[in-house]
Regions:
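Structural signature of hydrophobic alpha-helical transmembrane segments
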Residues: 105-122
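Membrane-interface loop-to-helix entry segments
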Residues: 15, 88-98, 136-139, 209-213
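Short, strongly hydrophobic alpha-helical membrane anchors
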Residues: 1-15, 232
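Divalent metal-coordination and catalytic microenvironments
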Residues: 48-50, 94, 199
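Hydrophobic, membrane-inserted alpha-helices
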Residues: 24-27, 100-104, 121-129, 143-151
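C-terminal membrane-associated helical module and adjoining short loops/tails
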Residues: 139-232
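Membrane-helix interface "capping/anchor" motifs
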Residues: 36-37, 110-113, 129-141, 156-159
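Small-residue-rich helix-interface/hinge motifs
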Residues: 33-87
Length: 232
């Protein structure tokens, strides 16, 4: 156990500045272009629904399960009071989760705790798998978890570091684009049951305020994450 813990908190040396810069560029390309974004967007959905689930548990709502769909949408099913702080916080957590996870990943990467980061991601995926209530969602989590397990068990340290960097940047950039897509749908009246509109019905604030708040947190996370992983 002591050996495993020592392995878990082993600090890797700082990456070369060009590695950080290229990792950021790679993540930005994935998020910016349609085809790679369609392929990878499901990972952001995992983080989004995971955020709802964690907050539901923290606010003592009954978590009934999570569903992930092939169109990269998802839903987290909870039971409890239909109004009140618990419901508000649960609805609020989804769009914030990818950016905050990206910020946490950026901090761990900056600290050189790459192995701890990868094992942490694997643990979160396993916990989420236990809550999945549809076959497609289970398949996606098994594939993602299998890839993460293979990375931590078989990939050399420098490869793990690059993947961790790209993943941190991807979560940070990937936390922004769904908010843009959300507002675009809202402007066309195609997202009446979005998290922002649910929050508007739960509180006195309009849905546009929550879109603004989501975007503010996402952009601040990108800025602070970039500061932490500053290649210069």
């Amino acid at each position: 156990m002591d050996k495993f813990w020592a392995h878990l908190i082993k600090v890797q040396p700082d990456p070369d500045p060009w590695v950080v810069a290229v990792s950021a560029l790679a993540a930005l390309v994935i998020v910016s272009f349609r085809m790679p974004w369609q392929v990878s967007r499901g990972l952001i959905t995992i983080a989004h629904e995971g955020g709802h689930a964690v907050m539901a548990l923290l606010t003592r709502r009954k978590l009934e399960g999570i569903r992930l769909h092939s169109d990269t949408s998802g839903v987290t099913l909870t039971r409890g009071r239909p109004t009140g702080p618990g419901m508000v916080l649960t609805a609020l957590a989804g769009y914030l989760a990818p950016s905050l996870l990206g910020l946490g990943a950026a901090w761990l990467t900056e600290q050189g705790l790459i192995t701890l980061l990868i094992w942490g991601v694997l643990l979160l995926l396993v916990c989420m798998l236990l809550l999945i209530r549809n076959l497609y969602g289970a398949l996606i989590l098994l594939v993602t978890g299998g890839a993460v397990f293979a990375l931590v068990m078989y990939a050399p340290a420098d490869v793990q570091q690059v993947v961790a960097l790209v993943s941190a940047w991807f979560l940070l950039f990937g936390g922004v684009r769904p908010i843009v897509e959300l507002q675009r749908k809202r402007s066309r009246r195609q997202a009446r049951d979005s998290d922002a509109d649910q929050l508007a019905r739960l509180t006195v604030l309009p849905g546009g305020f929550y879109v603004f708040f989501f975007m503010l947190v996402a952009l601040v996370s990108v800025a602070f994450g970039a500061y932490l992983m500053n290649p210069l």
